[in-house]
Amino acid sequence: MENDKGQLVELYVPRKCSATNRIIKADDHASVQINVAKVDEEGRAIPGEYITYALSGYVRSRGESDDSLNRLAQNDGLLKNVWSYSR
C-alpha cells in the first residue's frame, strides 16, 4: 500500500526464496537472509555493495541451503569452479 506521497507504507513486505522462488511466509521462523559483500581486487569489502539471498525454512530443513547458495553465487559471478554432485 502507498500513501499520498507514493511511499511504501506496508508493515510487512513478503520475500521470495532465492533458491525456489516460493514466497516466505511471515511465520517461517527458520528462514534466513544472507548478505554477501562485493570485494575489490585486494579482497576488501566495498561499503554498501552486496548481494542479498533469502533462503526459506523449507530449503534449510532439507539440507539444500549450501548447494543453493553455491549455485546462486556462481550464477551471480561470485564463485568459480565449485564442485556439484548434479554436474
Curated annotation (Swiss-Prot):
GO cellular component: cytosol; cytosolic small ribosomal subunit
Residue runs in coiled coils: none
Statement: the UniProt record of this protein carries the keyword Acyltransferase: no
Subcellular location: Cytoplasm
Main localization, broad class: cytoplasm
One annotated GO biological process: translation
Mutant lacking the gene: phenotype: Reduction in growth rate, a decrease in free 40S subunits, an increase in the amount of free 60S subunits and a decrease in polysome size.
Modified residues (N-acetylmethionine): M1
Keyword field: Acetylation, Cytoplasm, Ribonucleoprotein, Ribosomal protein, rRNA processing
Molecular function via GO: structural constituent of ribosome
Pfam families, alphabetized: Ribosomal_S21e
PTM: N-terminally acetylated by acetyltransferase NatB.
Record-stated family: Belongs to the eukaryotic ribosomal protein eS21 family.
PANTHER family associated with the record: 40S RIBOSOMAL PROTEIN S21
Subunit structure: Component of the small ribosomal subunit (SSU). Mature yeast ribosomes consist of a small (40S) and a large (60S) subunit. The 40S small subunit contains 1 molecule of ribosomal RNA (18S rRNA) and 33 different proteins (encoded by 57 genes). The large 60S subunit contains 3 rRNA molecules (25S, 5.8S and 5S rRNA) and 46 different proteins (encoded by 81 genes).
Extra facts: Present with 15300 molecules/cell in log phase SD medium.
Role of this protein: Component of the ribosome, a large ribonucleoprotein complex responsible for the synthesis of proteins in the cell. The small ribosomal subunit (SSU) binds messenger RNAs (mRNAs) and translates the encoded message by selecting cognate aminoacyl-transfer RNA (tRNA) molecules. The large subunit (LSU) contains the ribosomal catalytic site termed the peptidyl transferase center (PTC), which catalyzes the formation of peptide bonds, thereby polymerizing the amino acids delivered by tRNAs into a polypeptide chain.
Protein name: Small ribosomal subunit protein eS21B
Top-level taxonomy: Eukaryota, Fungi, Dikarya, Ascomycota, Saccharomycotina
